[in-house]
């Protein structure tokens, strides 16, 4: 299973990490932290204003790493020989790598090694084939984009070249789909201002609409058509007829 990098804290102080947190973030964005990987080793705080909490990107990452590590059996976690490999984008600089290591330390992971994501991808492929080769790895995640050329020789993988964009990923595709497909439909059918993104009143609406857009985008990976489904009862807006 995939564990999204998301944190959600409800008004009672209960903390959720992963899929439940990500899904709840659409309905209550001020209770959630998402996309903090982009902010690693920056001075940008992550604010959960609904619960009056401010976290650093490293603290957010530590919460996710702690949750993932907790999936292991207790005897494995407590074994001194147990180590953890964390994959990071090829475009991560040394400061971002140091921040990732700091998050791992805060999460109590113990022995940790970092591996560039293209290298990990090639190693995964090589487990299923015997021949060495040169690979072009195109890695687009939720927040980052990397393109790399890697070579496998005798089971060892070397990264020959790489390039990337720290602020380009699936979430940016969501934004483009929203701006060009969903937003025009919302403006045509509901009583909304043109600059709704600048109005805090519509923050939850925007998050719900973006969440629905993402779901449709994922469907398009396997289908030629997808429906963006927006539950009107949760949008909290009136249509053009006033209903």
Predicted regions and their residues:
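Oxyanion-binding/catalytic loops of NTP- or PPi-dependent enzymes
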Residues: 1-39, 53-54, 74-243
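A glycine- and small-residue-enriched flexible loop/hinge segment at structural boundaries
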Residues: 42-43
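Transmembrane alpha-helix boundary signature
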Residues: 46-48, 72-76
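Adenine-nucleotide phosphate-binding core of ATP-dependent small-molecule kinases
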Residues: 49-70, 241-243
């Amino acid at each position: 299973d995939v564990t999204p990098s998301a944190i959600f804290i409800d008004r009672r102080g209960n903390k959720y990490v992963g899929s439940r947190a990500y899904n709840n973030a659409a309905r209550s964005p001020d209770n959630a932290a998402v996309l903090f990987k982009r902010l690693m080793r920056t001075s940008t705080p992550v604010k959960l204003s609904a619960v009056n909490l401010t976290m650093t990107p490293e603290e957010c990452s530590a919460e996710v790493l702690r949750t993932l590590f907790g999936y292991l059996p207790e005897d494995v976690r407590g074994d001194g020989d147990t180590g953890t490999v964390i994959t990071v984008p090829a475009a991560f600089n040394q400061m971002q790598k140091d921040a990732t290591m700091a998050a791992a330390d805060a999460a109590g992971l113990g022995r940790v090694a970092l591996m560039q994501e293209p290298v990990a991808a090639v190693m995964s492929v090589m487990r299923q084939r015997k021949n060495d080769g040169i690979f072009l790895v195109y890695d687009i995640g939720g927040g980052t984009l990397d393109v790399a050329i890697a070579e496998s020789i005798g089971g060892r993988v070397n990264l020959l070249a790489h390039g990337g964009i720290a602020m380009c990923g699936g979430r940016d595709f969501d934004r483009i789909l929203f701006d060009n497909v969903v937003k025009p439909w919302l403006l045509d059918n509901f009583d909304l201002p043109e600059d709704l993104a600048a109005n805090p009143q519509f923050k939850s609406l925007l998050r719900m609409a973006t969440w629905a857009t993402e779901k449709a985008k994922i469907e398009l990976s396997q289908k030629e058509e997808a429906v963006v489904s927006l539950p009107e009862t949760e949008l909290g807006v009136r249509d053009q007829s006033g209903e």
